[in-house]
A protein has these predicted regions:
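N-terminal leader/linker segments that precede catalytic domains of diphosphate-processing enzymes
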Residues: 1-134
Length: 134
């Protein structure tokens, strides 16, 4: 252990999702990881699971959907962040429901890169959250 010389900094709310599948060829399960940009301050160049910080827009959407999902707003926000980060980093539309195909998922990913928030993407594509998937 080491002495940090004081109190630890406050934790940053974040969410990560671990995605794996059975190998279609019958081999061992496959695990999805992404490589962080080498220019990133934290863990630049590292192989990581999709995920990241819970943004204020995730907390706002979490508040809006908490009652209908039965989740606490904070828990909903963390799950929303996992869905958003997965779409943003991989193009996979996990935790979402509606008419979703690869073309729409890529368009949604591009929109998300521009807006940074999941709620406008849901509205634009007439999608809804299906957090039971995750």
């Amino acid at each position: 252990m080491f002495d940090t010389g004081g109190e630890a900094p406050p934790a940053t709310p974040a969410a990560t999702i671990v995605i794996f599948r059975n190998d279609p060829a019958g081999g061992p399960p496959q695990l999805l990881m992404v490589e962080r940009s080498a220019e990133m301050r934290f863990a630049g160049g590292a192989a990581v699971f999709p995920g990241g910080r819970v943004d204020p827009a995730d907390f706002a959407l979490g508040e809006r959907i908490a009652a209908e999902t039965g989740l606490a707003p904070d828990e909903a926000a963390h799950q929303i962040a996992a869905v958003r980060e997965t779409l943003e980093e991989t193009g996979l539309a996990l935790g979402l429901a509606g008419e979703i195909d690869a073309t729409k998922a890529q368009a949604a990913r591009a929109m998300l890169a521009h807006s940074g928030a999941l709620a406008p993407v849901l509205e634009a594509f007439d999608w809804r959250l299906d957090l039971a998937q995750i």
